[in-house]
Structures are given as structure tokens and as C-alpha cells.
């Protein structure tokens, strides 16, 4: 288990997890403001008490902790605001201009990057002071979000049907070396120094009042084949199991300004909010078996892309999309033929010739294969 301890956690929860009673207080949230840190300390103490005995050091299942979420990248709208005033966001004043709504590319320079990194470091120190000691600490890696250099693993994301962005074909079905250049770059770290670890792979998506995309099962399978072939060495979903938004004394804790349902957080996930499985559950399970059985071989392998792979566009329906993970004289070939918001076609008479260190391998050994559409 890897636990996201916040304080800001988003998840389409009211204020992204920040309580109403911090709205309008005379200090900056999500910063090292002393008054804010008093509440962080109180929160972390409560979380630590609830997790006591479940940490890996105690023989439990918790092997990792994510600190904060999308710090200096994204925020949630405050559910309360003064009449006739624009929406306020759960973010420090100096980060307002940099704040995105949802996972996306950050085009602007961060105004106070060191303040963000230092706040992340402080959060880790507070967590440790309450005994939340784990082998792995992670932080949002995409969109130039704040991290703790050399102390956390910056995790990655990919959403192919985002309801917060313009409708269009996603680049996340094109093979790239995401270990060197992570998705949603620029980022605040050098990719080659860290493992490429997926945390929010959008194999589903939450419907909103204004956007209600239906995601086919093939979308999740294609996304994960592409991500592993592009260098990912970990699998993490958002969401893998849907849920139900909890209810408080005055209503449900849903992110109402964002137009999400009050109760359902099904997310079209592989396992739905009531425990039912979708077709995506079964297709992804094959990938999970592959990683479980061959992950120790895959992890140290680098990415080899075909010549001119960087010229393939999402709308290109006739060029084979593939990549190789390779080390010395062994490797794995990853092929996909899916693209969101686009009709694909079968690719016939396909064969690959792989030049290894000491031999040349043809796939298939004889003849050709057909890569069916949406595979």
C-alpha cells in the first residue's frame, strides 16, 4: 500500500481535502507558514495514529507515502466564496498564476520553486516526527510540480480522456522515452536520475456535469502497453477501484464547483464503485501477470525506439506503433494499435527485424502478422 497523506489530496473531494474552516484565514495554505503547519502537524498526528501497526517497518503493508499532491501545479476550487466574486483556489497567493485545473503541461515558469520544494521537505519531516517512516516517499512529478530532490520518487501520470481539457487525440498512445523526457514535461527533475514510476494512469475518468466521456476497455490496455514500452517501471492507476464520496454533517464531500456527482466516484474504473469488474479489469490483469512474472527482467532495460518514431502523430492510423525494452542480448517488444477519439484500422503484413548485440531476430520468425485495430 502507498498512502497519500495530503494535506491537499484533491481526488475531486471538497476543497481538495482542505477543510472549509481554513478558508480566508490570515495565513497561506500549502506553504511553510507557521500557522498552517500547526494544522498539518495535527492532521499528520491523527493519520499516523490510524495507520499505527500497518507500516512496513512493523510488518504491515504500507511501503510508501505520497507527500501533498500536485504542489505548485494544480489546486481545487474552494467550495465556499463571497457572492459575485470569482472562484478562489486552494493555493498560496504566489502560486495563483501557475495553478492549473487538472493534470496538464505547465507552460509558465514557477514563481517560487524553492519555496515549494522546501515545503515538501518540511512535510516529510513532520511525517517522520509522527513515525510515518516508509521505504519509499513519492511526490507529483508532472507539470513542474514541487519535489524533494534525491529524497522522493517523482511519479508520473497520463490521462487520455481528461474532462478538464479540450477534446482531442491524446499523445499518450505514442511510444516515447518517458524515462528521459516524462509526460507532461517540463518537470522539476532530471528523469534519468529516477525510476519512471506511474501513479495516475487514467484507465477511467470521472464524469462531470458538462463532460461525460465513455472510455472503452481497449483505452486502458493500450495506455499501459505504451507506458511500459516507453520506460515505465511501475504501475499505478487513478482510479483502479471506484468509490463513493463520503457524507458529512452538512452534505457530501464532493467537489461540487467542478460539477462532479455528489455521491458516485465510480470513475469508470476497472473495478467499479460497488465492486463489479469491467472489461478493462480483465485486459489489464494480463499486463499485471506479465509485470509480476517478468518485471525483474524488464526493470533494468532501456528504451529503443524505431527510426522516425518522433514524427508519428496521434492521427496517423497506418504506421505501426512499437518500442523495445532491451538490455544486452534480450528484450521485450511492445506494440499497440489504439488511439482515442480516432477510428483505427487493422495493420496487415507486419514483421519486425531486431538487431541485437550478437544476432538479428525477426518477429515473427516466418511470415507476417496482422495487428488488429484497437489492440
Model-found features: residue ranges?
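Outer-envelope exported proteins of Gram-negative bacteria
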Residues: 2-4, 62-64, 137-139
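Short, solvent-exposed loop/turn and secondary-structure capping segments
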Residues: 6, 12-17, 75-80, 85, ...
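Active-site-adjacent "subsite" loops/lids of carbohydrate-active enzymes
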Residues: 8-51
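Active-site-proximal loop/short-helix segments
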Residues: 17-18, 63-94, 257
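Short, hinge-like loop/turn segments at secondary-structure boundaries
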Residues: 18-23, 152-157, 253-254
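Carbohydrate-binding surfaces of carbohydrate-active enzymes
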Residues: 25, 36-48, 58-63, 71-73, ...
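Active-site-proximal helices and loops of the catalytic beta/alpha 8
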Residues: 86-169
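Glycoside hydrolase catalytic-domain groove-lining segments
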Residues: 146-209, 223, 264-266, 271
Amino acid at each position: 500500500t502507498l498512502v497519500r497523506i495530503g494535506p491537499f489530496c484533491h481526488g475531486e473531494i471538497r476543497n481538495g481535502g482542505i477543510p472549509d474552516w481554513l478558508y480566508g484565514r490570515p495565513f497561506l495554505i500549502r506553504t511553510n507558514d507557521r500557522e498552517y503547519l500547526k494544522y498539518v502537524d495535527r492532521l499528520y498526528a491523527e493519520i499516523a495514529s490510524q495507520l499505527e501497526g500497518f507500516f512496513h517497518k512493523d510488518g504491515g503493508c504500507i511501503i510508501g507515502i505520497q507527500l501533498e499532491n500536485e504542489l505548485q501545479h494544480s489546486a481545487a476550487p474552494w467550495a465556499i466564496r463571497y457572492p459575485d466574486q470569482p472562484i478562489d483556489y486552494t493555493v498560496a497567493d504566489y502560486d495563483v498564476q501557475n495553478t492549473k485545473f487538472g493534470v496538464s503541461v505547465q507552460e509558465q515558469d514557477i514563481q517560487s520553486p524553492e519555496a515549494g520544494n522546501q515545503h515538501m521537505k518540511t512535510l516529510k519531516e513532520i511525517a517522520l516526527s509522527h513515525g510515518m517512516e516508509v521505504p519509499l516517499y513519492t511526490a507529483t512529478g508532472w507539470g513542474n510540480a514541487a519535489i524533494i530532490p534525491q529524497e522522493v520518487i517523482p511519479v508520473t501520470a497520463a490521462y487520455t480522456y481528461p474532462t478538464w481539457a479540450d477534446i482531442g487525440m491524446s499523445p499518450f498512445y505514442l511510444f516515447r522515452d518517458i524515462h528521459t523526457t516524462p509526460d507532461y514535461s517540463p518537470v522539476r527533475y532530471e528523469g534519468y536520475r529516477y525510476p519512471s514510476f506511474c501513479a495516475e494512469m487514467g484507465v477511467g475518468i470521472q464524469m462531470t456535469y458538462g463532460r461525460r466521456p465513455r472510455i472503452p476497455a481497449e483505452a486502458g490496455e493500450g495506455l499501459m502497453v505504451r507506458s511500459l514500452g516507453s520506460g515505465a517501471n511501475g504501475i499505478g492507476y487513478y482510479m483502479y477501484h471506484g468509490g463513493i464520496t463520503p457524507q458529512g454533517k452538512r452534505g457530501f464531500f464532493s467537489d461540487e464547483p467542478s460539477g462532479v456527482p455528489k455521491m458516485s466516484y465510480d470513475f469508470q474504473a476497472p473495478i467499479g464503485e460497488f465492486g463489479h469488474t469491467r472489461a478493462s479489469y480483465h485486459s489489464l490483469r494480463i499486463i499485471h501477470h506479465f509485470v509480476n512474472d517478468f518485471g525483474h527482467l524488464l526493470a533494468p532495460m532501456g528504451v529503443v525506439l524505431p527510426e522516425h518514431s518522433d514524427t508519428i502523430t496521434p492521427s496517423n492510423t497506418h504506421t505501426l506503433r512499437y518500442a523495445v525494452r532491451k538490455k544486452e542480448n534480450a528484450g521485450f517488444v511492445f506494440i499497440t494499435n489504439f488511439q482515442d477519439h480516432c477510428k483505427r484500422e487493422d495493420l496487415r503484413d507486419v514483421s519486425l527485424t531486431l538487431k541485437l548485440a550478437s544476432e538479428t531476430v525477426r518477429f515473427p520468425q516466418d511470415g507476417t502478422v496482422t495487428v488488429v485495430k484497437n489492440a
